[in-house]
């Protein structure tokens, strides 16, 4: 029986590389996957997932008006698995569509994303995935500064100073965000 998985972790926890690995494993067995990513994440190129170690793959971009269920139901042959990157950027309705894919099409869905933002508040997509996922799995990495387990994301400005207010979504990578533990989020050892 198919399930909805939410695999969440801080920055640099290997979420995208895990998607690429899972896709490879399915395809190695002559099974098909449908890969989606946020249409607002344009760090590399819209419609692609790209890992920090340089691996890249095409993916269907999700925008506010995208109906993920309708896209998946029309894929022939029916995919054996649906994979999503940057799922923190999903909207509530998108999460309901993912649950519908699992419940009505019996296709497993694995969503990967951040749980919380730089203010340590939940993203909309993460909130509803936490509520509706059948299985929650934490992907771990270490704090940028002290090597404890990273559970938060620290945003820094162009001068490298910590930022705790502002718009929730600002697309960026290691130049503006760091995986950190709770202690280093509150008092980052930045000069």
UniProtKB/Swiss-Prot annotation:
Binding site for Zn(2+): 143, 146, 181, 184
Compartments, as annotated in UniProt: Cytoplasm
Primary enzyme class: transferase
Residues annotated as the enzyme's active site: 86
Substrates-to-products reaction catalysed: thymidine + ATP = dTMP + ADP + H(+)
Keyword set includes Nucleotide-binding: yes
Molecular function per GO: ATP binding; thymidine kinase activity; zinc ion binding
Protein name as it appears in the record: Thymidine kinase
Species in which this protein is naturally found: Listeria monocytogenes serovar 1/2a (strain ATCC BAA-679 / EGD-e)
């Amino acid at each position: 029986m198919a399930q909805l998985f939410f695999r969440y972790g801080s920055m640099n926890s290997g979420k995208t590389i895990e998607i690429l690995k899972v896709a490879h494993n399915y395809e190695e067995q002559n099974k098909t996957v449908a890969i989606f990513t946020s249409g607002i994440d344009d760090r590399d190129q819209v419609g692609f997932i790209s890992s920090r170690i340089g691996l890249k793959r095409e993916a269907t971009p999700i925008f506010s008006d995208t109906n993920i269920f309708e896209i998946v139901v029309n894929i022939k042959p029916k995919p054996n698995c649906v994979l999503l990157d940057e799922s923190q950027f999903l909207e509530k309705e998108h999460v309901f569509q993912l649950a519908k894919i699992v419940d009505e099409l019996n296709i497993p869905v694995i969503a990967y994303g951040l749980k919380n933002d730089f203010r340590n508040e939940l993203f909309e997509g993460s909130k509803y995935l936490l509520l509706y996922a059948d299985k929650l799995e934490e992907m771990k990495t270490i704090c940028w500064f002290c090597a404890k387990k990273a559970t938060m994301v620290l945003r820094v400005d162009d001068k490298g100073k910590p930022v705790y207010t502002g718009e929730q979504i600002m697309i960026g990578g290691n130049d503006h965000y760091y995986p950190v533990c709770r202690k280093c989020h509150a008092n980052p050892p930045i000069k």
